[in-house]
Amino acid sequence: MHERYVPADVEAAAQSDWRAADAYRSKEDANRKKFYCVSMLPYPSGKLHMGHVRNYTINDVMYRYLRMNGYNTLMPMGWDAFGMPAENAAMANGVPPAQWTYENIAYMKKQMQSMGLAIDWSREVTTCKPDYYKWNQWLFLKMLEKGVAYKKTGTVNWDPVDQTVLANEQVIDGRGWRSGALVEKREIPMYYMRITQYADELLNDLDGLGWPERVKVMQHNWIGKSFGVNFGFPYELDGEKKLLRVFTTRADTIMGVTFCAIAAEHPLAARLARDKPALQAFIDECKRGGVAEADIATMEKKGVATGFSVSHPLTGEPVEVWIGNYVLMSYGEGAVMGVPAHDERDFAFAKKYGLPIRQVIAVEGETYSTDAWQEWYGDKTRAVCVNSGKYDGLAHDAAVDAIAAELKAGGLGDKQITYRLRDWGISRQRYWGTPIPIIHCPSCGDVPVPEQDLPVVLPEDLVPDGTGNPLAKSDAFLNCTCPKCGAAAKRETDTMDTFVDSAWYFSRYAAPDAQTMVDARTDYWMPMDQYIGGIEHAILHLLYSRFWAKVMRDLGLVAFGEPAKNLLTQGMVLNETFYREDAAGKKTWYNPADVTVSFDDKGRPVGAVLKSDGQPVELGGIEKMSKSKNNGVDPQMLIDHYGADTARLFTMFAAPPEQQLEWSGAGVDGASRFLRRVWAFGFANREALAVRAPFDAAQLAEADKTLRREIHGVLKQADFDYQRLQYNTVVSAAMKMLNAIEGAKGATPAVLRETYGVLLRVLYPVVPHVTFELWKALGYADEFGPLLDAPWPKVDEAALEQAEIELVLQVNGKVRGALKVAKDASREAIEAAAVADEMFAKFAEGRPAKKIIVVPGRLVNVVV
């Protein structure tokens, strides 16, 4: 054992032992409780960031603690390797996405290994490899057979210059990110998955999950189950009588309808735009906008009157039809009723275009005005109908029932349950993804690839150039034979949404070498006992993975219908930001490592200069670490300088796992100093710590009893904190233990050995390298086995018992000292001790005690 703690040497030695023992390979064992903990697999972007370090350390701590407690634990890892960033990097660097991806995986895997993570690498999954995505294709075909997957037209962003489809994030101010061309909306055939078929189950099953309430609410709102009325506004056009159908949850406001708005893609819009160039121009403008719901929600609401009216279904009054850029064809019926008096969006639209505003609900004590929107205008809990004829005086529910009944009687509508959730469109007009296993035959149409011909292998040597899909230009991939008739045919060139890849990877970890999609091992490990990832995945990834599990269950592949029992969403890692702004308002961001900050006398930052030129930079505040703000910390530099254990200790100590973590260089230094103290104590006391003499706890001297009482008391709290995932207070507990052990005067070697061994085991899940090496060097491994599987220390409840307790001594209600009495002292004995105490004599000044108040276990108050 070396005197000085050298992290690089300690960590290399520990990792060498773990590799030699294949320490983290997990096997199924029906006789043991299992614990399957998974971190969301990373995209191989090139390097780990501090968010990765935090996520994987949380997972690792959980794994090690539960393994010490006898669980059969598994922590796997893989790579979410398909996706657009690889294509962008390929275009920038002129290399195939496959090369860029595999090089990044190799580097990031090396970084993970340097962190000492307890990963079973024999289960590694890479989603861009054919042996994985074969099963994406296989399940897609099964879903196609069952009608869960199907084909229909969908709207995409089309770049007319690059001749390619753009993701929503590639459309900037209505233009393509590369070409700058005005983006068009196009309708193209796409494959969808019928997630709406599972909407109610996805909603109801949320109740049984140990997930953060915030995530459950987000999913609940995304699914968006609504109870309302679907009805039509009658109209006649070209000699045909039709209905303009809408859905509303506020049928009680139907008498306040003053206009209807339809989507630019609505069939009625195209018909009404004939011979109306201005109307057609507006439709074209709408189609150039983004297709994302978020874009629609934030953009300026605009509309154009069509000059056409439909009839109000209850009054027969004419209702003007507008085309609105905020109406989505993909939601509801592609049309909405406009009730400006009681819908905030409609109110703003009506004020902008001078449309009538008709109040039809009222709240007692409130006065309606069309001057400005007030929150109560949309209130349905207190509202009653007014200006609504026979419905006047009805509350929301009663009005909806009555109006729905009248619409139904007239054949115009009825009550309906709808969902905000839409079927999952999985077709992507991109190269780097799972090929959709469909063949297009001139005679047979769309033909599924036969199961025996899977996987349809994606060529890995293509380099995208930004003009269309490379697969459509690859004769070797594109041209094939129809499996039905043998004629020349073409392969489908769309690939699957990358959310397909991440929808089930955790099931493949359980059986990575299976010759089927999953096998019995999957039902042993799944569902995950703990899933860990960022809140940004609360909706899409987590919702799709839940849907995928239910589909696999219904196909008889697995026994579970939910992929994760418990979910932890770790907080973001934050850091200071610094910038300079030029005359044009453009900001240049500087990394905190390149800046010197000055502080006031209270430690608050008041200024900063760039180290390279000594000139001032602006303080931008604390924000999430990101490339855009240049405020990241390279984990590899941290590990190289301080060691992985210091990085792990700081990230666990600085904040509870679910809360944001503020980066602190001083905090990292403090973590490093603490580990040096742990090592230094072990080295300085190595001979005493080697003593394995048994002891009778009841016969120990007071110094030993005091140390054991403190250590076992802290151990009890640390064990509780491990169970509730509060790892920051676990580290605090370890620091208290070290302080107690270092400060113990007169403790015997045997008790020092016991208590230091407890400290090492409490710290081990957080800092496995240094504790593993100390455990081995000081002979603990010879007694208990390697720290990997050493049993978790048990609290000695007897050690917590105290012969004496300390009571607060008060004289006339003021604290004057402390009183030590036997734990089982009688009230009379406590009173006698109080009046005999020298502090009582000092403050009583010779006056006798009139009354003595004893609060058992807490205080004694003598009134004079």
UniProtKB/Swiss-Prot annotation:
What residues bind ATP, as annotated? Answer: 627
For this chain the motif 'HIGH' region maps to 42-52
How is this protein annotated for GO cellular component? cytosol
E.C. designation(s): 6.1.1.4
Location in or out of the cell: Cytoplasm
Q: Which UniProt keywords apply?
A: Aminoacyl-tRNA synthetase, ATP-binding, Cytoplasm, Ligase, Nucleotide-binding, Protein biosynthesis
A Pfam family name for this chain?
A: tRNA-synt_1
- Sorted alphabetically, which CDD domains does this protein's record hold? Anticodon_Ia_Leu_BEm, LeuRS_core
Tell me the first and last residues of the signal peptide.
none
Example GO biological process term?
A: leucyl-tRNA aminoacylation
Q: Where is this motif: 'KMSKS' region?
A: 624-628
Record's superkingdom? Bacteria
* Catalytic reaction(s) noted: tRNA(Leu) + L-leucine + ATP = L-leucyl-tRNA(Leu) + AMP + diphosphate
Q: Under the GO molecular function aspect, what terms does this record hold?
A: aminoacyl-tRNA deacylase activity; ATP binding; leucine-tRNA ligase activity
Q: Which NCBIfam families match?
A: leuS_bact
Q: Which family does it belong to?
A: Belongs to the class-I aminoacyl-tRNA synthetase family.
Full protein name: Leucine--tRNA ligase
